[in-house]
Amino acid sequence: MTALYYTYYPSPVGRLLILSDGESITHIDFEKEQYAPNPKWHKQDELPVFQKVRLAFERYFNGEVECFSNIPLKPEGTAFQQAIWQALREIDYGELSTYGELALRINNPKAVRAVGGAVGSNPISIIIPCHRILGKDRTLTGFGGGLEAKRFLLQLEKIPYIDKGTENTKPRFFKKYHE
């Protein structure tokens, strides 16, 4: 069994737990209130891959568009999940997609529900950008980090969305982070 290492990143959307096998990132998750690292994981803040991720997050949260392309990722999942996660990575900064559009991207237009399940099980939040997925009418849908975090990320990237019937296009939280 491969050893897993972890560190944290204090992002503006909450503390992120980052896991690595020592070479690649395997998970990035929003730390939950009752969340405790697995005792088999090793705390290691200085891994080169963790340093790359920290720098990429600093750039991302400061509004830089291309930050994550040099981060080695190794998410574990089925072939279907892997296809969806790869399709998510092809959605550029500032763009949005829907579950239906993702199903079309993988040439399986009837798999919308399965696509939703794969998006929901994304193990590498933000870098595999599941926050860029909205309902077919641009409405907010669920997000592992919570809707407030999703709003922040969408506003950071200036992605317009509809929240409770109101269109939001202004990056109001972006300014807050920089003050």
Curated annotation (Swiss-Prot):
This enzyme catalyzes only one turnover and therefore is not strictly catalytic. According to one definition, an enzyme is a biocatalyst that acts repeatedly and over many reaction cycles. CDD domains: ATase. PANTHER family: METHYLATED-DNA--PROTEIN-CYSTEINE METHYLTRANSFERASE (PTHR10815:SF5). Disulfide bonds: none annotated. GO terms for cellular component: cytoplasm. Pfam families: DNA_binding_1, Methyltransf_1N. Involved in the cellular defense against the biological effects of O6-methylguanine (O6-MeG) and O4-methylthymine (O4-MeT) in DNA. Repairs the methylated nucleobase in DNA by stoichiometrically transferring the methyl group to a cysteine residue in the enzyme. This is a suicide reaction: the enzyme is irreversibly inactivated. GO terms for molecular function: methylated-DNA-[protein]-cysteine S-methyltransferase activity. Keywords: Cytoplasm, DNA damage, DNA repair, Methyltransferase, Transferase. It is found in: Cytoplasm. It catalyses: a 6-O-methyl-2'-deoxyguanosine in DNA + L-cysteinyl-[protein] = S-methyl-L-cysteinyl-[protein] + a 2'-deoxyguanosine in DNA; a 4-O-methyl-thymidine in DNA + L-cysteinyl-[protein] = a thymidine in DNA + S-methyl-L-cysteinyl-[protein]. It comes from Haemophilus influenzae (strain ATCC 51907 / DSM 11121 / KW20 / Rd). The keyword DNA repair applies. SUPFAM superfamilies: Methylated DNA-protein cysteine methyltransferase domain, Methylated DNA-protein cysteine methyltransferase, C-terminal domain. Belongs to the MGMT family. The keyword S-adenosyl-L-methionine does not apply. GO terms for biological process: DNA alkylation repair; methylation. Its EC number is 2.1.1.63. The active site is at C130 (nucleophile). This is Methylated-DNA--protein-cysteine methyltransferase.
